[in-house]
Amino acid sequence: AAADEAGRPVLVAGSMGPSGELMEPMGTMTPDSCADAFASQAEGLASGGADLLWIETMSSLDELEAAVVGARRTSERPIAATMRFETAGPTMMGVTGEDAARRMIDLGLAAIGANCGNNIAETESAVVQILSGAGDTPVIVKANAGVPEFRGDSLIYSGSPEVMGAHVQRMVDAGVSI
């Protein structure tokens, strides 16, 4: 595998994203059915060689918790988790960075943070909130390089390498480690 050929220590993260369903009472997904789905994914990722499990782009803390419960049923791999924050600040389910940090810390995750988002400033704002409650837990930032748009046959992101480099430096300076 590519990780074995890297010539340096490499961790392979098995990614699991949101189900696309809403938890009861707003939707039909139960915590148990959600956990079952994530257990199956975690088992496959672990047997495929993932060193850690990465639950990402979540908007609901209840779904995130069910995903963690499910993943822990079938794997002892460390778990990192990130949430997606929206234009007004919280996730689409109303979760703030502070709320996310508290719940993710309570779940005993190996690393916590934010990913995706509509723009870098929103992601940075959420990450600063997460940092304030993270304690010694490593914090992750994985922002989009802007909102993608089609130009002809190409999908283009507005964030240049310079914009992304400045973003990364701000986050490192703030205390982000992943």
Language-model regions, residue ranges each:
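Domain-level signal for soluble alpha/beta catalytic cores
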Residues: A1-I178
